[in-house]
Amino acid sequence: MTTSSATTPLKQIICIKWGTKYGADYVNKLYGMVSRNITPPFRFVCFTDNTDGIRPEVECQDLPIIDYPMPVGTTGQWPKSRLWSEKLGNVTGNVLFLDLDVVIVGNIDVFFEYEPNHPVVLTRNMTNPLEKLGQTSLFRFPVGALAPLQKLFASDPQGIAEKY
């Protein structure tokens, strides 16, 4: 759902759905939680390989194209690296990424307000709080800011996935 206002910046939420592990119901529920817990205006975009069953309020776009193989036999959801591209469809500016399986129980405006001049904001990994790596179930970034990371990852996807 996109709601317009002349005085409030547009909040952009993105998610990614590929394969069959998570169906359209996850996208639809995530959209519902976001819409109940955000101050408009907002835009909700799902990058996906299958739009079947996704509610019409969700703006679906094709998965960003990558030219490197996905790692095998490693932990982590490396297809998310598609979102590190220089361009993300017609989305520009700051975005808040949410995994499809997150549960939202309160207002998420703070994620757009926290450290507004910091280019990338990651959540801490609560299962390992002393770890210096961020947790990417939720992170905010300007489109294109992670392109150098994608370039590095593309140089050795398997090796990097095994290391991290």
State the predicted function of each range:
Residues 1-164:
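Glycosyltransferase catalytic domains, chiefly GT-A lineage
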